[in-house]
Amino acid sequence: MNPYRQIPRFAFVAAAVASTVALHSQQTGNGPASAPAAKTLTAADCTAAKLGSEIPIKAIGEPVSAVTLSAPQWHAETANAPGYCGIEGSMAPVDKGGTARPIRFGVALPATWLRRGAQLGGGGMNGSIPMLAGGVGRGQPSLLSQGFATYGSDSGHQMSFGMPGRGMGMPGAPGLAAANPAADQWALNDEAIANLGYMQLKKTHDAAMVLLQRVYGDLPRYNYFFGSSQGGREALTVAQRYPEDYDGIAAEVPILSFSTLMLAPELIRIQEKPLANWVTPAKVNAIRGEFMRQCDKLDGLTDGVINNYMACRAIFDRKQGDPNRNPWIARRCPNNVDPNPQDTSSSACLTDGQIATLEMVYSPYVFASPLANGVRSFGMWVPNTDPSGSGLIANVRYRGQEGAADNAPVHGHLGVLGVTGFLFRDLTANPLDYVEGGALNKRRMELSAILDSTNPDLSAFQKRGGKLIVVIGTNDTLASPGAQLAYYQSVLDELERAAVDSFARFFVLPQTGHGLSGTTYNTDGDGKSITVRPIPNVYERLSLITDWVENGRAPGKSVAVTAGERSMPMCSYPEYPKYSGGPAGSASSYTCAAQ
Protein backbone atom coordinates (compact mmCIF):
# COMPACT_ATOMS: atom_id res chain seq x y z
CA MET A 1 0.00 0.00 0.00
CA ASN A 2 1.31 3.43 -0.88
CA PRO A 3 1.68 5.32 2.44
CA TYR A 4 1.04 8.67 0.76
CA ARG A 5 -2.22 7.71 -0.95
CA GLN A 6 -4.42 8.96 1.88
CA ILE A 7 -2.72 9.77 5.15
CA PRO A 8 -3.98 12.69 7.22
CA ARG A 9 -0.91 12.86 9.43
CA PHE A 10 1.94 10.65 10.52
CA ALA A 11 1.72 9.58 14.14
CA PHE A 12 5.48 9.46 14.52
CA VAL A 13 7.07 12.43 16.26
CA ALA A 14 10.66 12.02 17.27
CA ALA A 15 11.82 12.75 20.78
CA ALA A 16 13.89 15.66 19.51
CA VAL A 17 10.82 17.22 17.93
CA ALA A 18 8.74 16.70 21.05
CA SER A 19 11.29 18.53 23.16
CA THR A 20 11.43 21.33 20.60
CA VAL A 21 7.66 21.76 20.76
CA ALA A 22 7.66 21.78 24.53
CA LEU A 23 10.35 24.43 24.70
CA HIS A 24 8.80 26.94 22.33
CA SER A 25 5.27 26.28 23.56
CA GLN A 26 5.75 27.32 27.18
CA GLN A 27 4.39 30.79 26.44
CA THR A 28 0.80 30.33 25.29
CA GLY A 29 -0.01 33.96 24.56
CA ASN A 30 -2.77 34.16 27.19
CA GLY A 31 -1.35 37.30 28.77
CA PRO A 32 1.54 39.74 28.86
CA ALA A 33 5.00 38.30 29.21
CA SER A 34 8.41 39.79 29.75
CA ALA A 35 10.36 40.47 26.58
CA PRO A 36 12.83 37.66 25.83
CA ALA A 37 16.49 38.57 26.05
CA ALA A 38 18.15 39.16 22.69
CA LYS A 39 20.62 36.64 21.31
CA THR A 40 23.31 37.79 18.92
CA LEU A 41 25.50 36.28 16.24
CA THR A 42 28.15 37.54 13.86
CA ALA A 43 29.69 36.45 10.60
CA ALA A 44 32.11 34.37 12.65
CA ASP A 45 29.16 32.26 13.84
CA CYS A 46 27.85 31.70 10.31
CA THR A 47 29.97 28.66 9.55
CA ALA A 48 29.52 25.03 8.60
CA ALA A 49 31.49 24.15 11.72
CA LYS A 50 28.74 25.64 13.88
CA LEU A 51 25.66 24.84 11.79
CA GLY A 52 26.77 21.46 10.49
CA SER A 53 26.34 19.73 7.17
CA GLU A 54 23.30 17.58 7.95
CA ILE A 55 20.36 17.12 10.30
CA PRO A 56 19.44 13.70 11.76
CA ILE A 57 16.26 12.34 10.20
CA LYS A 58 14.98 11.44 13.68
CA ALA A 59 14.63 15.19 14.34
CA ILE A 60 12.08 15.56 11.53
CA GLY A 61 8.47 14.75 12.38
CA GLU A 62 7.45 13.52 8.93
CA PRO A 63 9.38 10.93 6.86
CA VAL A 64 12.55 11.95 5.01
CA SER A 65 15.52 9.84 3.98
CA ALA A 66 18.22 12.48 4.55
CA VAL A 67 18.66 16.17 5.38
CA THR A 68 21.77 17.87 4.03
CA LEU A 69 22.88 21.48 4.47
CA SER A 70 24.75 23.77 2.13
CA ALA A 71 27.47 26.10 3.34
CA PRO A 72 25.96 29.04 5.25
CA GLN A 73 26.41 32.56 3.91
CA TRP A 74 26.64 35.80 5.84
CA HIS A 75 24.62 38.72 4.43
CA ALA A 76 25.81 42.16 5.44
CA GLU A 77 23.38 44.72 6.82
CA THR A 78 21.45 46.77 4.23
CA ALA A 79 18.97 49.62 4.40
CA ASN A 80 16.13 47.08 4.38
CA ALA A 81 17.44 44.26 6.55
CA PRO A 82 19.99 43.66 9.29
CA GLY A 83 22.95 41.39 8.89
CA TYR A 84 21.96 37.76 8.92
CA CYS A 85 23.20 34.25 8.34
CA GLY A 86 21.41 32.44 5.52
CA ILE A 87 21.52 28.69 5.12
CA GLU A 88 19.74 26.38 2.72
CA GLY A 89 19.23 22.66 2.84
CA SER A 90 17.67 19.73 1.04
CA MET A 91 15.46 16.94 2.36
CA ALA A 92 15.59 13.77 0.29
CA PRO A 93 12.31 11.94 -0.36
CA VAL A 94 11.52 8.50 0.98
CA ASP A 95 10.39 7.35 -2.48
CA LYS A 96 13.81 7.18 -4.10
CA GLY A 97 12.67 5.19 -7.12
CA GLY A 98 9.85 7.48 -8.17
CA THR A 99 9.44 11.07 -9.30
CA ALA A 100 9.39 12.68 -5.85
CA ARG A 101 11.71 15.67 -5.56
CA PRO A 102 13.77 16.91 -2.64
CA ILE A 103 12.38 19.65 -0.43
CA ARG A 104 14.62 22.67 -0.60
CA PHE A 105 14.38 24.92 2.42
CA GLY A 106 16.01 28.04 3.78
CA VAL A 107 16.53 29.65 7.18
CA ALA A 108 17.53 33.27 7.86
CA LEU A 109 19.20 33.88 11.23
CA PRO A 110 19.40 37.58 12.20
CA ALA A 111 22.34 39.20 13.94
CA THR A 112 20.00 40.19 16.77
CA TRP A 113 17.39 37.57 17.59
CA LEU A 114 14.49 38.23 19.95
CA ARG A 115 13.52 34.56 20.16
CA ARG A 116 10.82 35.01 17.56
CA GLY A 117 10.38 32.49 14.75
CA ALA A 118 8.35 32.94 11.57
CA GLN A 119 7.60 30.29 8.98
CA LEU A 120 6.65 31.86 5.66
CA GLY A 121 4.19 30.28 3.26
CA GLY A 122 4.44 30.03 -0.49
CA GLY A 123 2.36 31.15 -3.45
CA GLY A 124 0.75 29.72 -6.57
CA MET A 125 1.69 26.05 -6.70
CA ASN A 126 4.91 26.86 -4.80
CA GLY A 127 8.23 25.74 -6.26
CA SER A 128 10.66 28.21 -4.73
CA ILE A 129 11.85 29.19 -1.26
CA PRO A 130 10.00 32.29 0.01
CA MET A 131 11.86 35.59 0.31
CA LEU A 132 13.06 35.25 3.89
CA ALA A 133 14.48 38.77 4.26
CA GLY A 134 11.19 40.58 3.57
CA GLY A 135 8.22 41.76 5.63
CA VAL A 136 4.68 40.43 5.93
CA GLY A 137 2.62 43.54 5.26
CA ARG A 138 2.20 46.29 2.70
CA GLY A 139 5.29 48.46 3.14
CA GLN A 140 6.24 46.74 6.38
CA PRO A 141 9.89 46.37 7.45
CA SER A 142 11.81 43.13 7.28
CA LEU A 143 10.89 40.51 9.86
CA LEU A 144 14.60 40.04 10.46
CA SER A 145 14.87 43.65 11.63
CA GLN A 146 12.18 42.92 14.22
CA GLY A 147 14.01 40.04 15.81
CA PHE A 148 12.50 37.15 13.85
CA ALA A 149 14.38 34.19 12.48
CA THR A 150 12.54 33.23 9.29
CA TYR A 151 12.26 29.97 7.39
CA GLY A 152 10.37 28.37 4.51
CA SER A 153 10.60 25.85 1.68
CA ASP A 154 9.73 25.21 -1.96
CA SER A 155 7.35 22.45 -0.74
CA GLY A 156 9.15 19.66 -2.58
CA HIS A 157 9.32 20.68 -6.23
CA GLN A 158 11.13 23.35 -8.17
CA MET A 159 9.21 25.75 -10.38
CA SER A 160 8.77 29.36 -11.47
CA PHE A 161 5.61 30.64 -9.71
CA GLY A 162 4.73 27.02 -9.30
CA MET A 163 4.05 26.27 -12.93
CA PRO A 164 6.53 25.35 -15.65
CA GLY A 165 5.51 23.07 -18.47
CA ARG A 166 1.81 22.40 -18.71
CA GLY A 167 1.13 24.47 -15.65
CA MET A 168 2.05 27.72 -17.37
CA GLY A 169 -1.37 28.00 -18.96
CA MET A 170 -2.67 31.02 -17.08
CA PRO A 171 -6.30 32.01 -16.52
CA GLY A 172 -7.72 33.63 -19.60
CA ALA A 173 -4.84 32.52 -21.83
CA PRO A 174 -5.64 30.71 -25.08
CA GLY A 175 -4.35 27.44 -23.66
CA LEU A 176 -1.39 25.71 -22.14
CA ALA A 177 2.23 26.39 -22.79
CA ALA A 178 4.18 23.61 -24.41
CA ALA A 179 4.22 20.56 -22.18
CA ASN A 180 7.39 19.94 -20.24
CA PRO A 181 7.01 16.34 -19.04
CA ALA A 182 10.32 16.27 -17.19
CA ALA A 183 9.46 19.37 -15.16
CA ASP A 184 5.96 18.20 -14.31
CA GLN A 185 6.57 14.57 -13.36
CA TRP A 186 6.44 15.41 -9.67
CA ALA A 187 2.68 15.97 -10.08
CA LEU A 188 2.29 12.21 -10.63
CA ASN A 189 4.00 11.27 -7.35
CA ASP A 190 1.95 10.84 -4.19
CA GLU A 191 4.82 11.70 -1.84
CA ALA A 192 5.38 14.96 -3.72
CA ILE A 193 1.65 15.73 -3.53
CA ALA A 194 1.61 14.99 0.21
CA ASN A 195 4.62 17.24 0.66
CA LEU A 196 2.80 20.07 -1.10
CA GLY A 197 -0.33 19.37 0.91
CA TYR A 198 1.12 19.39 4.40
CA MET A 199 4.24 17.33 5.12
CA GLN A 200 6.77 19.91 3.93
CA LEU A 201 5.41 22.33 6.53
CA LYS A 202 6.29 20.07 9.44
CA LYS A 203 9.59 19.00 7.91
CA THR A 204 10.70 22.58 7.34
CA HIS A 205 9.63 23.68 10.82
CA ASP A 206 11.54 20.88 12.50
CA ALA A 207 14.71 21.44 10.47
CA ALA A 208 14.61 25.16 11.30
CA MET A 209 14.29 24.42 15.02
CA VAL A 210 17.43 22.30 14.89
CA LEU A 211 19.39 25.11 13.24
CA LEU A 212 18.13 27.73 15.68
CA GLN A 213 19.26 25.56 18.56
CA ARG A 214 22.66 25.06 17.00
CA VAL A 215 23.42 28.71 16.29
CA TYR A 216 21.70 30.50 19.19
CA GLY A 217 21.64 27.70 21.75
CA ASP A 218 17.91 28.29 22.18
CA LEU A 219 14.49 27.95 20.54
CA PRO A 220 11.78 30.51 19.79
CA ARG A 221 9.68 31.71 22.66
CA TYR A 222 7.08 32.77 20.13
CA ASN A 223 6.68 30.95 16.84
CA TYR A 224 4.48 32.27 14.03
CA PHE A 225 3.24 31.36 10.57
CA PHE A 226 2.52 34.01 7.95
CA GLY A 227 1.04 33.23 4.55
CA SER A 228 -1.18 34.49 1.75
CA SER A 229 -2.95 32.53 -1.00
CA GLN A 230 -1.20 29.13 -1.07
CA GLY A 231 0.64 30.34 2.01
CA GLY A 232 -2.72 31.17 3.58
CA ARG A 233 -3.84 27.60 3.02
CA GLU A 234 -0.58 26.44 4.56
CA ALA A 235 -1.20 28.71 7.56
CA LEU A 236 -4.57 27.06 8.19
CA THR A 237 -3.03 23.65 7.54
CA VAL A 238 -0.56 24.03 10.41
CA ALA A 239 -3.33 25.27 12.72
CA GLN A 240 -5.27 22.11 11.90
CA ARG A 241 -2.47 19.52 11.71
CA TYR A 242 0.40 20.85 13.83
CA PRO A 243 -1.21 23.15 16.43
CA GLU A 244 1.49 22.66 19.06
CA ASP A 245 4.18 24.15 16.83
CA TYR A 246 2.81 27.71 16.58
CA ASP A 247 1.76 30.50 18.90
CA GLY A 248 0.36 32.86 16.28
CA ILE A 249 -0.90 32.35 12.73
CA ALA A 250 -1.85 35.07 10.24
CA ALA A 251 -3.44 34.03 6.94
CA GLU A 252 -4.67 36.11 4.02
CA VAL A 253 -6.86 34.93 1.12
CA PRO A 254 -6.28 31.19 1.81
CA ILE A 255 -7.00 28.71 -0.99
CA LEU A 256 -8.27 26.30 1.62
CA SER A 257 -10.42 23.95 -0.51
CA PHE A 258 -7.36 23.49 -2.69
CA SER A 259 -8.25 20.24 -4.45
CA THR A 260 -11.53 21.66 -5.77
CA LEU A 261 -10.20 25.15 -6.41
CA MET A 262 -7.81 23.66 -8.98
CA LEU A 263 -10.74 21.87 -10.60
CA ALA A 264 -13.22 24.76 -10.45
CA PRO A 265 -12.12 26.55 -13.66
CA GLU A 266 -12.60 23.24 -15.48
CA LEU A 267 -16.06 22.85 -13.96
CA ILE A 268 -17.03 26.20 -15.47
CA ARG A 269 -15.67 25.24 -18.90
CA ILE A 270 -17.51 21.89 -18.63
CA GLN A 271 -20.72 23.79 -17.86
CA GLU A 272 -20.00 25.79 -21.02
CA LYS A 273 -19.50 22.76 -23.26
CA PRO A 274 -22.80 23.54 -25.02
CA LEU A 275 -22.25 26.66 -27.11
CA ALA A 276 -25.50 28.11 -25.77
CA ASN A 277 -24.03 28.19 -22.23
CA TRP A 278 -20.95 30.23 -23.12
CA VAL A 279 -20.78 33.52 -21.24
CA THR A 280 -18.65 35.68 -23.55
CA PRO A 281 -16.49 38.66 -22.54
CA ALA A 282 -19.06 40.96 -24.14
CA LYS A 283 -21.35 40.29 -21.15
CA VAL A 284 -18.97 41.47 -18.41
CA ASN A 285 -20.46 44.95 -18.00
CA ALA A 286 -24.00 43.59 -17.94
CA ILE A 287 -23.07 41.09 -15.23
CA ARG A 288 -21.33 43.49 -12.87
CA GLY A 289 -23.90 46.16 -13.62
CA GLU A 290 -26.64 43.79 -12.45
CA PHE A 291 -24.68 42.91 -9.31
CA MET A 292 -24.28 46.61 -8.57
CA ARG A 293 -27.91 47.45 -9.35
CA GLN A 294 -29.25 44.90 -6.90
CA CYS A 295 -26.55 45.03 -4.21
CA ASP A 296 -24.86 48.44 -4.02
CA LYS A 297 -27.47 50.01 -1.74
CA LEU A 298 -27.79 46.98 0.57
CA ASP A 299 -25.21 48.53 2.93
CA GLY A 300 -27.15 51.79 3.24
CA LEU A 301 -25.04 53.77 0.76
CA THR A 302 -25.09 53.83 -3.05
CA ASP A 303 -21.40 54.34 -3.72
CA GLY A 304 -20.13 51.67 -6.12
CA VAL A 305 -19.17 49.26 -3.33
CA ILE A 306 -20.92 46.00 -2.44
CA ASN A 307 -20.24 45.91 1.29
CA ASN A 308 -23.18 43.68 2.24
CA TYR A 309 -21.67 40.58 0.66
CA MET A 310 -23.90 38.10 2.49
CA ALA A 311 -27.17 39.67 1.35
CA CYS A 312 -25.86 40.03 -2.19
CA ARG A 313 -24.76 36.40 -2.28
CA ALA A 314 -28.19 35.33 -1.06
CA ILE A 315 -29.80 37.12 -4.01
CA PHE A 316 -27.71 35.39 -6.69
CA ASP A 317 -27.23 32.00 -5.02
CA ARG A 318 -30.04 29.90 -6.48
CA LYS A 319 -29.61 27.33 -3.71
CA GLN A 320 -30.93 29.89 -1.22
CA GLY A 321 -34.55 30.99 -1.01
CA ASP A 322 -37.30 30.31 -3.54
CA PRO A 323 -35.91 27.98 -6.23
CA ASN A 324 -38.31 29.46 -8.78
CA ARG A 325 -36.99 33.01 -8.52
CA ASN A 326 -34.66 34.34 -11.20
CA PRO A 327 -32.31 37.12 -10.06
CA TRP A 328 -31.24 37.61 -13.69
CA ILE A 329 -34.75 38.19 -15.06
CA ALA A 330 -34.07 41.88 -15.77
CA ARG A 331 -31.19 40.91 -18.05
CA ARG A 332 -32.87 37.95 -19.79
CA CYS A 333 -33.02 38.21 -23.59
CA PRO A 334 -36.60 38.50 -24.88
CA ASN A 335 -37.76 35.10 -26.15
CA ASN A 336 -34.27 33.79 -25.23
CA VAL A 337 -32.79 35.33 -28.40
CA ASP A 338 -29.83 37.71 -28.15
CA PRO A 339 -30.33 40.39 -30.82
CA ASN A 340 -26.78 41.68 -30.43
CA PRO A 341 -24.26 39.18 -28.99
CA GLN A 342 -21.46 41.76 -29.39
CA ASP A 343 -23.18 44.34 -27.17
CA THR A 344 -20.70 45.22 -24.39
CA SER A 345 -22.94 47.69 -22.56
CA SER A 346 -24.42 47.21 -19.11
CA SER A 347 -27.83 46.76 -20.77
CA ALA A 348 -26.75 43.73 -22.83
CA CYS A 349 -29.03 40.75 -22.41
CA LEU A 350 -28.30 37.16 -21.34
CA THR A 351 -29.71 33.96 -22.78
CA ASP A 352 -31.09 31.16 -20.62
CA GLY A 353 -27.94 29.11 -21.20
CA GLN A 354 -25.73 31.99 -20.09
CA ILE A 355 -27.90 32.56 -17.03
CA ALA A 356 -27.57 28.87 -16.15
CA THR A 357 -23.78 29.21 -16.25
CA LEU A 358 -23.84 32.31 -14.05
CA GLU A 359 -26.07 30.50 -11.57
CA MET A 360 -23.49 27.73 -11.46
CA VAL A 361 -20.58 30.16 -10.89
CA TYR A 362 -22.33 32.10 -8.10
CA SER A 363 -23.88 29.18 -6.20
CA PRO A 364 -22.17 26.36 -4.27
CA TYR A 365 -21.12 23.40 -6.40
CA VAL A 366 -22.46 20.21 -4.78
CA PHE A 367 -20.23 17.12 -4.85
CA ALA A 368 -21.34 13.62 -5.74
CA SER A 369 -19.72 12.42 -2.49
CA PRO A 370 -18.55 14.35 0.59
CA LEU A 371 -14.87 15.26 0.61
CA ALA A 372 -12.50 15.50 3.58
CA ASN A 373 -13.99 16.79 6.84
CA GLY A 374 -17.50 16.09 5.54
CA VAL A 375 -17.44 19.01 3.09
CA ARG A 376 -20.32 18.51 0.65
CA SER A 377 -19.92 21.50 -1.65
CA PHE A 378 -17.51 24.12 -2.95
CA GLY A 379 -18.58 27.72 -2.42
CA MET A 380 -17.48 29.02 -5.85
CA TRP A 381 -17.62 32.83 -6.15
CA VAL A 382 -19.67 35.67 -4.72
CA PRO A 383 -21.04 38.62 -6.75
CA ASN A 384 -18.22 41.03 -7.54
CA THR A 385 -17.09 43.76 -9.91
CA ASP A 386 -14.51 41.60 -11.71
CA PRO A 387 -16.58 38.71 -13.10
CA SER A 388 -14.05 37.90 -15.82
CA GLY A 389 -11.04 37.94 -13.49
CA SER A 390 -8.60 35.00 -13.46
CA GLY A 391 -10.27 33.45 -16.48
CA LEU A 392 -13.73 32.97 -14.96
CA ILE A 393 -15.00 34.19 -18.34
CA ALA A 394 -13.19 32.76 -21.38
CA ASN A 395 -12.69 34.44 -24.74
CA VAL A 396 -12.17 31.28 -26.84
CA ARG A 397 -13.62 27.79 -27.19
CA TYR A 398 -11.50 24.92 -25.89
CA ARG A 399 -10.98 21.37 -27.01
CA GLY A 400 -14.01 19.33 -26.01
CA GLN A 401 -16.46 22.24 -26.20
CA GLU A 402 -19.14 22.58 -28.87
CA GLY A 403 -17.97 24.83 -31.67
CA ALA A 404 -14.26 24.45 -30.92
CA ALA A 405 -11.92 23.92 -33.86
CA ASP A 406 -10.20 20.57 -34.29
CA ASN A 407 -6.92 22.18 -33.27
CA ALA A 408 -8.43 24.19 -30.41
CA PRO A 409 -6.24 24.56 -27.32
CA VAL A 410 -6.66 22.41 -24.25
CA HIS A 411 -7.91 24.55 -21.40
CA GLY A 412 -5.27 25.53 -18.87
CA HIS A 413 -4.91 27.69 -15.78
CA LEU A 414 -2.61 28.22 -12.83
CA GLY A 415 -3.58 25.01 -11.03
CA VAL A 416 -4.09 22.73 -14.01
CA LEU A 417 -1.37 20.31 -12.85
CA GLY A 418 -3.63 19.53 -9.93
CA VAL A 419 -6.18 18.25 -12.45
CA THR A 420 -4.08 16.52 -15.10
CA GLY A 421 -1.35 15.34 -12.72
CA PHE A 422 -2.85 14.90 -9.26
CA LEU A 423 -6.34 13.85 -10.34
CA PHE A 424 -6.14 12.25 -13.81
CA ARG A 425 -2.53 11.08 -13.28
CA ASP A 426 -2.04 11.76 -16.98
CA LEU A 427 -0.25 14.95 -17.97
CA THR A 428 -1.70 14.74 -21.50
CA ALA A 429 -5.32 14.50 -20.31
CA ASN A 430 -7.98 17.00 -21.33
CA PRO A 431 -9.31 18.38 -18.03
CA LEU A 432 -12.73 18.91 -19.62
CA ASP A 433 -13.17 15.12 -19.63
CA TYR A 434 -13.82 15.21 -15.88
CA VAL A 435 -17.19 13.77 -14.80
CA GLU A 436 -18.52 14.53 -11.31
CA GLY A 437 -19.08 11.28 -9.43
CA GLY A 438 -17.40 9.27 -12.18
CA ALA A 439 -14.32 7.09 -12.29
CA LEU A 440 -12.17 9.72 -10.55
CA ASN A 441 -14.45 10.10 -7.53
CA LYS A 442 -12.30 7.98 -5.20
CA ARG A 443 -9.19 9.89 -6.23
CA ARG A 444 -11.02 13.15 -5.53
CA MET A 445 -11.62 12.04 -1.96
CA GLU A 446 -7.98 10.94 -1.55
CA LEU A 447 -6.65 14.27 -2.76
CA SER A 448 -9.05 16.23 -0.59
CA ALA A 449 -7.71 14.49 2.52
CA ILE A 450 -4.18 15.51 1.55
CA LEU A 451 -4.65 19.01 0.11
CA ASP A 452 -7.68 20.65 1.69
CA SER A 453 -7.40 22.80 4.82
CA THR A 454 -11.07 22.50 5.76
CA ASN A 455 -11.03 20.90 9.22
CA PRO A 456 -13.25 23.18 11.34
CA ASP A 457 -12.07 21.74 14.65
CA LEU A 458 -9.40 24.18 15.76
CA SER A 459 -9.85 23.32 19.44
CA ALA A 460 -6.33 21.91 19.82
CA PHE A 461 -4.86 25.20 18.62
CA GLN A 462 -7.23 27.12 20.88
CA LYS A 463 -6.40 25.02 23.95
CA ARG A 464 -2.64 25.47 23.54
CA GLY A 465 -3.19 29.25 23.59
CA GLY A 466 -2.69 29.84 19.88
CA LYS A 467 -4.05 32.94 18.14
CA LEU A 468 -5.34 33.09 14.56
CA ILE A 469 -6.17 35.98 12.23
CA VAL A 470 -7.59 35.37 8.74
CA VAL A 471 -8.52 38.03 6.18
CA ILE A 472 -10.30 37.47 2.86
CA GLY A 473 -11.62 39.69 0.06
CA THR A 474 -14.94 39.22 -1.72
CA ASN A 475 -13.63 40.32 -5.14
CA ASP A 476 -11.07 37.51 -5.14
CA THR A 477 -11.26 35.57 -8.40
CA LEU A 478 -8.19 33.36 -7.81
CA ALA A 479 -9.25 31.98 -4.45
CA SER A 480 -12.90 31.21 -3.76
CA PRO A 481 -14.60 33.64 -1.37
CA GLY A 482 -17.57 31.28 -1.28
CA ALA A 483 -15.39 28.45 0.02
CA GLN A 484 -13.67 30.78 2.49
CA LEU A 485 -16.98 32.02 3.88
CA ALA A 486 -18.19 28.43 4.18
CA TYR A 487 -15.08 27.57 6.20
CA TYR A 488 -15.59 30.55 8.50
CA GLN A 489 -19.13 29.33 9.13
CA SER A 490 -18.03 25.73 9.70
CA VAL A 491 -15.62 26.81 12.45
CA LEU A 492 -18.37 28.86 14.13
CA ASP A 493 -20.71 25.87 13.91
CA GLU A 494 -18.05 23.55 15.36
CA LEU A 495 -16.77 25.70 18.23
CA GLU A 496 -19.47 28.38 18.69
CA ARG A 497 -18.95 32.12 18.57
CA ALA A 498 -17.65 32.78 22.08
CA ALA A 499 -14.94 30.15 21.80
CA VAL A 500 -13.89 31.34 18.35
CA ASP A 501 -13.69 34.96 19.48
CA SER A 502 -11.37 33.94 22.31
CA PHE A 503 -8.58 32.94 19.92
CA ALA A 504 -9.48 33.83 16.30
CA ARG A 505 -10.57 36.68 14.08
CA PHE A 506 -12.21 36.00 10.72
CA PHE A 507 -12.18 39.31 8.83
CA VAL A 508 -13.69 40.20 5.44
CA LEU A 509 -12.65 43.11 3.20
CA PRO A 510 -15.53 43.63 0.75
CA GLN A 511 -14.74 44.32 -2.90
CA THR A 512 -11.03 43.55 -2.60
CA GLY A 513 -9.24 40.93 -4.66
CA HIS A 514 -6.55 38.32 -4.21
CA GLY A 515 -4.04 40.93 -3.07
CA LEU A 516 -6.67 42.49 -0.78
CA SER A 517 -6.76 45.61 -2.94
CA GLY A 518 -9.71 46.99 -4.85
CA THR A 519 -11.58 50.08 -6.00
CA THR A 520 -15.09 51.39 -6.10
CA TYR A 521 -16.88 50.57 -9.36
CA ASN A 522 -17.13 53.44 -11.84
CA THR A 523 -20.92 53.20 -11.96
CA ASP A 524 -23.05 52.99 -8.83
CA GLY A 525 -26.19 50.96 -8.27
CA ASP A 526 -28.37 53.74 -9.70
CA GLY A 527 -26.41 53.70 -12.96
CA LYS A 528 -24.64 56.98 -12.17
CA SER A 529 -20.98 57.43 -13.14
CA ILE A 530 -18.83 58.09 -10.07
CA THR A 531 -15.19 58.75 -9.23
CA VAL A 532 -13.18 55.58 -8.75
CA ARG A 533 -11.45 55.42 -5.36
CA PRO A 534 -9.30 52.75 -3.70
CA ILE A 535 -10.93 50.53 -1.09
CA PRO A 536 -9.23 51.06 2.30
CA ASN A 537 -7.14 47.96 2.96
CA VAL A 538 -4.06 48.88 5.01
CA TYR A 539 -3.88 47.38 8.49
CA GLU A 540 -1.13 46.39 10.91
CA ARG A 541 -0.97 42.70 10.12
CA LEU A 542 2.15 41.97 12.15
CA SER A 543 1.33 43.96 15.28
CA LEU A 544 -2.22 42.59 15.43
CA ILE A 545 -0.98 39.03 15.85
CA THR A 546 2.17 39.73 17.89
CA ASP A 547 0.31 41.97 20.35
CA TRP A 548 -2.27 39.26 20.87
CA VAL A 549 0.29 36.48 21.31
CA GLU A 550 2.97 38.30 23.28
CA ASN A 551 1.00 40.90 25.23
CA GLY A 552 -2.48 39.41 25.48
CA ARG A 553 -4.04 42.38 23.64
CA ALA A 554 -6.76 40.92 21.44
CA PRO A 555 -7.78 42.79 18.27
CA GLY A 556 -11.25 44.24 18.23
CA LYS A 557 -14.06 42.48 16.39
CA SER A 558 -13.55 45.22 13.83
CA VAL A 559 -10.26 46.83 12.81
CA ALA A 560 -9.80 50.14 10.99
CA VAL A 561 -8.28 49.91 7.52
CA THR A 562 -7.05 52.90 5.56
CA ALA A 563 -6.30 54.17 2.06
CA GLY A 564 -4.68 57.59 2.29
CA GLU A 565 -7.10 59.82 4.20
CA ARG A 566 -10.00 57.40 3.78
CA SER A 567 -10.83 54.71 6.35
CA MET A 568 -13.33 51.91 6.87
CA PRO A 569 -13.95 49.25 9.49
CA MET A 570 -12.82 45.73 8.57
CA CYS A 571 -15.55 43.61 10.13
CA SER A 572 -15.65 40.06 11.44
CA TYR A 573 -17.69 37.53 9.46
CA PRO A 574 -20.65 37.60 8.94
CA GLU A 575 -20.82 41.33 9.65
CA TYR A 576 -20.25 44.04 7.05
CA PRO A 577 -19.66 47.82 7.13
CA LYS A 578 -23.12 49.40 7.26
CA TYR A 579 -23.36 53.10 6.54
CA SER A 580 -24.85 54.99 9.48
CA GLY A 581 -24.38 58.59 8.32
CA GLY A 582 -21.55 61.07 7.99
CA PRO A 583 -18.58 61.35 5.61
CA ALA A 584 -18.47 58.27 3.39
CA GLY A 585 -14.67 58.15 3.65
CA SER A 586 -14.55 57.88 7.44
CA ALA A 587 -14.69 54.66 9.45
CA SER A 588 -16.77 56.48 12.08
CA SER A 589 -19.63 56.64 9.56
CA TYR A 590 -20.05 52.87 9.58
CA THR A 591 -21.00 50.17 12.03
CA CYS A 592 -20.33 46.47 11.65
CA ALA A 593 -23.74 44.89 11.20
CA ALA A 594 -25.13 41.44 10.49
CA GLN A 595 -28.16 40.62 8.38
Language model features with spans:
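Gram-negative bacterial Sec-dependent N-terminal signal peptides
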Residues: 2-24
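Catalytic-loop region of hydrolases
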Residues: 26-116, 129-138, 302-306, 315-425, ...
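Cap/lid segment of the alpha/beta-hydrolase catalytic domain
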Residues: 124-217, 263-264, 428-450, 512-531
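Alpha/beta-hydrolase fold nucleophile elbow
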Residues: 218-229
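Short glycine-enriched nucleophile-adjacent loop
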Residues: 232-243
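Hydrolase active-site cap/lid region
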Residues: 241-244, 248-285, 308-310, 392-393, ...
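Short beta-strand/loop motif that positions the catalytic acidic residue
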Residues: 470-472
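Conserved alpha/beta-hydrolase "acid-adjacent" motif
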Residues: 478-482
